[in-house]
Amino acid sequence: MNPGYFITGTDTHVGKTWASIALMQYFKRQAKVVVGMKPVAAGCMLSDSYEGGGQYLCNEDALLMQTHASLHQSYDLINPYAYELPVSPHIAGVDDPVDFAKILECFDALKASADIVIVEGAGGWHAPLNAQQDIGDLAKALDLPVILVVGIKLGCINHAKLTYQAIQQSGLACAGWIAVCVAGDMLNKDENIQTLKAALSAPLLGVLPHTLTADFDLLAEQLVINQ
């Protein structure tokens, strides 16, 4: 069994977090112990409820992953790099740059207590994390199969084909892709999804419907993953 999956997307705001938590719920239904990880996040909020006392920066998506895990994990393991500025991590973290060694240490700690770790990347495949490395480099360092989240909107076919090509060039396996209907008024949505099915050789794992309120159990029902 795979120790986890790396979740990337065609862009930012394409539904990676909802897809990630839907995957967590899906595997929990398979009686797996599942935890989530968002190694790098920007635009974080200051919280007064740090587990060890005092204030800390936290990310809403990472908190959702913490809440929906099979067992409680320290926030520091789930989101080791939390930046306040809502900009690219390589800019937000100029004074505290992302170090892959720290992320790998946190991942190993999570993996030791779970069957599956769902790791959500920031932004798209080539989003920079520090001066030299990007999301694709992190996926390679973790050596996890990749699941591509495609936000179904105008331009998604081009974005999906380019991202899928980059994943293939990295040498990592693409376990499949998830369509997320981010635009409620998308014209010819089904035709776009069929075009993507023909263009991407990886399997379609599910289509998540457009919704303003997340029902992660319902979203999990839309997924089928063959491990």
Where are the model-predicted features located?
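N-terminal phosphate/diphosphate-binding loop that engages ATP/GTP or pyrophosphate donors
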Residues: 18-97, 108-109
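C-terminal binding/interaction regions
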Residues: 193-207, 211-226
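Glycine-rich phosphate-binding P-loop
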Residues: 6-20
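Phosphate-binding/switch loop-helix module in NTP-utilizing enzymes
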Residues: 86-129, 136
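Conserved active-site and cofactor/substrate-binding residues in soluble primary-metabolism enzymes
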Residues: 14-18, 56, 60, 82, ...
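Extreme N-terminal starter segment of soluble prokaryotic enzymes
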Residues: 1-6, 33
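Conserved catalytic-core segment of NTP-binding enzymes
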Residues: 13, 122-202, 206
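Short beta-strand segments
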Residues: 8, 38, 120, 178
